[in-house]
From Swiss-Prot:
It comes from the Bacteria. GO terms for cellular component: cytoplasm. This is Probable alpha-L-glutamate ligase. Mg(2+) 1 binds at residues 248, 260. SUPFAM superfamilies: Glutathione synthetase ATP-binding domain-like. Keywords: ATP-binding, Ligase, Magnesium, Manganese, Metal-binding, Nucleotide-binding, Protein biosynthesis. Pfam families: RimK (PF08443), Rimk_N (PF18030). One of its GO terms (molecular function) is metal ion binding. The gene is rimK. Mn(2+) 2 binds at residues 260, 262. ATP binds at residues 141, 178-179, 187, 211-213. Binds 2 magnesium or manganese ions per subunit. Its EC number is 6.3.2.-.
Length: 301
C-alpha cells in the first residue's frame, strides 16, 4: 500500500513510528506537511498538490492533525476522501472530536458516563451554573484548550465565580465540570484501535497538580482496566466515529466517566509505558480495512 501521513513534523515520535511500522510491513509511507498540501476542488477530478506536484496513487491516509490546524487539516483530509483514499480517521469525526462541547453532547445522548458539565453564556447565570455541577470544588475548561492548558480547578464558590466571570469577560467559551475528587488526580488513557482497547495506561498528576496530562508533568504507569472501562472506551470511540482514539477515563464512585476522546493520540507515552507496538497495530488496522472508496463519508463531506 501507499500510505500518506499528514503531519507537520516528520521528526515527532508518533510520525516516526508510523513511518517505521508501515515501512517494516512493506508499505510505501510518505510524510506530507499538512499546511503545504493545497487543493484543486474541481468537478469529477478533485486533486491535491504538494510542493508543485499532484499527489496520486495513495491507498490510505493517516491524519496527525494538530489542534491549531484542525480547520485546514480537515479540509485536506476531506479532499483525500473525495479522491477515494481511505482515512484512518474521517474528517467529520476529527472535527466532531475537536469540539469538546459537541463531543460531550453526543456522548451524553448515548448514555456514556460523563462528569456533570454545565455551559452558559450570561454572567447572570453563574450562581445556578455552579449549583448545577454540585458546587465547588469544580473544574473550568476553555473549550479550545489542549494538553491541559486552559483548565482551572476552583476550590471555592467565590473563586469559581471570579474565574468564570473573567473568562466570560474575555469572550472565552468555557465549560464547568464537577470535580471528581475520588480519582485522586489520575486518569486512564485507553488506546482504541477498531473495536478493541489495544493498550491502556494510568496517568498520575504530579504532587500538588490535578491535571494528569504527560505534557504537564504527569507520570504514566501500567494499569489493568475493568471490563466496564474497556466497554466505555470502545463505545465512546464508536459514538465519535473514530477508528483510532485515545479515550481518557476517570474512575469515579459511580463508574467510569469519559473526560475526552482524542482523535490524534500520541504514541510515545503509550508505547514506552506498555512496551506494545501500537504503531504496528494501527498499520495492521489499515491493511484490514482500507480499500478504494471505503470512507463512510462517501464524498458527501
Amino acid at each position: 500500500m501507499k500510505i500518506a501521513v499528514l503531519s507537520r513534523n516528520p521528526r515527532l515520535y508518533s510520525t516516526r513510528r508510523l513511518v517505521e511500522a508501515g515501512t517494516q510491513r512493506g508499505h510505501e509511507v510518505v510524510v506530507i506537511d499538512t499546511l503545504r498540501a493545497y487543493m484543486n476542488i474541481a468537478s469529477h477530478k478533485p486533486q491535491i498538490h504538494y510542493r508543485g506536484k499532484p499527489l496520486e496513487g495513495f491507498d490510505a491516509v493517516i491524519p496527525r492533525i494538530g489542534a491549531s490546524v484542525t480547520f485546514y487539516g480537515c479540509a485536506v483530509l476531506r479532499q483525500f476522501e473525495m479522491m477515494g483514499v481511505y482515512p484512518l480517521n474521517e474528517s467529520v469525526a476529527i472535527a466532531r472530536s475537536r469540539d469538546k462541547l459537541r463531543s460531550l453532547q453526543l456522548l451524553s445522548r448515548r448514555g456514556i458516563g460523563l462528569p456533570i458539565t454545565g455551559f452558559a453564556h450570561s454572567p447572570d447565570d453563574i450562581p445556578d451554573l455552579i449549583q448545577m455541577v454540585n458546587g465547588a470544588p469544580l473544574v473550568i475548561k476553555v473549550l479550545e484548550g489542549t494538553q491541559g492548558i486552559g483548565v482551572v480547578l476552583c476550590e471555592t464558590t467565590k473563586a469559581a465565580e471570579s474565574v468564570i466571570e473573567a473568562f466570560m469577560g474575555l469572550k472565552q467559551n468555557i465549560m464547568v465540570q464537577e470535580y471528581i475528587k475520588e480519582a485522586g488526580g489520575a486518569d486512564i488513557r485507553c488506546f482504541v484501535v477498531g473495536d478493541k482497547v489495544i493498550a491502556s495506561m494510568k496517568r498520575q498528576a504530579k504532587p500538588g497538580e490535578f491535571r494528569s496530562n504527560l505534557h504537564r508533568g504527569g507520570v504514566a504507569s501500567l494499569i489493568k482496566i475493568t471490563p466496564e472501562e474497556r466497554m466505555t472506551a470502545i463505545r465512546a470511540a464508536k459514538v465519535m466515529g473514530l477508528s483510532v482514539a485515545g479515550v481518557d477515563i476517570l474512575r469515579s464512585n459511580h463508574g467510569p466517566l469519559v473526560m475526552e476522546v482524542n482523535s490524534s493520540p500520541g504514541l510515545e507515552g503509550i508505547e514506552v509505558t506498555t512496551g506494545k507496538d501500537v504503531a504496528g497495530m494501527i498499520i495492521e488496522h489499515l491493511e484490514k480495512n482500507s480499500g478504494p472508496n471505503q470512507t463512510r463519508t462517501k464524498g458527501k463531506g
